[in-house]
């Protein structure tokens, strides 16, 4: 690969890197953006991936909605209780108190990952300068240059 210059290089194809790439492409479709991804190219290879739940804030949902990347299956968080056993004090928040539908959401990592990959594929069709490179430990990326590098 000869020297390639990008506006943004995103190192990491997990949910944060995918969301960053999709949002940047949606806002700046002509930008030269590269996503370096160690995950398999084929979504079917991720079907049995990590099924643990992760908690996302309401703000994360709003961002993911803007790039059409909200998974269909999630559980809403209605109440948060923060305390330390044997210590004085606690914090308790409810969705009713804050006048929100939910304080956050629990989503399977695999579901958000696959939904973001699908959303990015749809967005990248309008971005002629997007470069999604699936890499491994043998891939040489030393010839890439960028104005901004995101480690995600």
Language-model segment annotations:
Residues 75-152:
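Conserved N-terminal helical subregion
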Residues 5-6, 30, 145-147:
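Active-site acidic short loop of glycosyltransferases
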Residues 9, 32-34, 81, 131:
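A structural signal for isolated positions on well-ordered beta-strands in alpha/beta enzyme cores
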Residues 19:
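Short alpha-helical segment within the catalytic ATP-binding CA
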Residues 11, 23-52:
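Glycine-rich FAD pyrophosphate-binding loop
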Residues 31, 71, 128-130:
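A structural micro-motif
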Residues 46-85:
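N-terminal FAD cofactor-binding segment of flavoenzymes
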Residues 2-16, 34:
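Beta1/beta-strand and adjacent pyrophosphate-binding region of the FAD-binding site
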